[in-house]
């Protein structure tokens, strides 16, 4: 998230003429895509624990979604 914020601040410093250019918009799109993870967030749908992000597990009863596994840490 800090990377996205810093990149947005850098684009802001360049001025609106460059910020609104198609190349700049494509660059920002790439930044946001890089932040997307291949796991499901809290309350995201799942079918197994591996679908969920770290410290989340797939709920074993319907409705199946990712819930906190009561662990802490990195």
From Swiss-Prot:
Domain of life: Eukaryota
Entry's Gene Ontology molecular function annotations: ion channel inhibitor activity; toxin activity
Cystine crosslinks: 39-53, 46-58, 52-66
One of the Pfam families matching this protein, by short name: Toxin_12
Primary location recorded for the protein, binned into one broad class: secreted
Cellular component aspect of the GO annotation: extracellular region
Keywords: Disulfide bond, Ion channel impairing toxin, Knottin, Secreted, Signal, Toxin
Propeptide section residues: 8-36
Cross-referenced SUPFAM superfamilies: omega toxin-like
Signal peptide per UniProt: 1-7
Keyword Signal: yes
Expression across tissues: Expressed by the venom gland.
Purpose: Probable ion channel inhibitor.
Domain-level remarks: The presence of a 'disulfide through disulfide knot' structurally defines this protein as a knottin.
Similarity-based family: Belongs to the neurotoxin 10 (Hwtx-1) family. 38 (Jztx-33) subfamily.
Protein name (record): U19-theraphotoxin-Cg1a
UniProt organism field: Chilobrachys guangxiensis
């Amino acid at each position: 998230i800090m990377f996205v914020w810093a990149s947005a601040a850098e684009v802001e410093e360049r001025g609106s003429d460059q910020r609104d250019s198609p190349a700049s918009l494509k660059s920002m799109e790439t930044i946001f895509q890089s932040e997307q993870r291949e796991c499901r967030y809290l309350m995201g749908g799942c079918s197994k624990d591996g679908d969920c992000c770290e410290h989340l597990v797939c709920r074993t009863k319907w409705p199946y979604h990712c819930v906190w596994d009561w662990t802490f840490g990195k």
